[in-house]
Amino acid sequence: MKVAKVFTTGRSQAVRIPKAFQFDTKEVIIQRFGNGILLIPKNSDWQGFLEALNEFEPDFKIEREPQIEQVREDFL
């Protein structure tokens, strides 16, 4: 796992992104997840997914019936 440096520039906090992780774009979407953040290129296929995540309530849980264990034969 790589480590990036966090620093302050003016009134903003910034992260020095290692070369292997640099973006090929001028803008990114930023999304907070718990105590972490996710950066995705602005013009990415993930943009719609991230927008959809914002529609869920913070305490959203999927309720479902417990799975019944399946008995299967060995594959080989």
UniProtKB/Swiss-Prot annotation:
Note the InterPro entries from the entry.
Anti_VapB2-like, SpoVT-AbrB_dom, SpoVT-AbrB_sf, VapB_TA_antitoxins
**S-S bridge residues:** none
From what superkingdom does this record's organism come?
A: Bacteria
Query: Which keywords accompany this UniProt record?
Result: DNA-binding, Virulence
User: Mind listing the GO molecular function terms for this protein?
Assistant: DNA binding
SpoVT-AbrB domain: residues covered: 4-44
The family assignment reads: Belongs to the VapB family.
Could you identify this protein by its name? Virulence-associated protein B
Q: Which species does the entry assign this protein to? A: Dichelobacter nodosus
Name of the coding gene: vapB
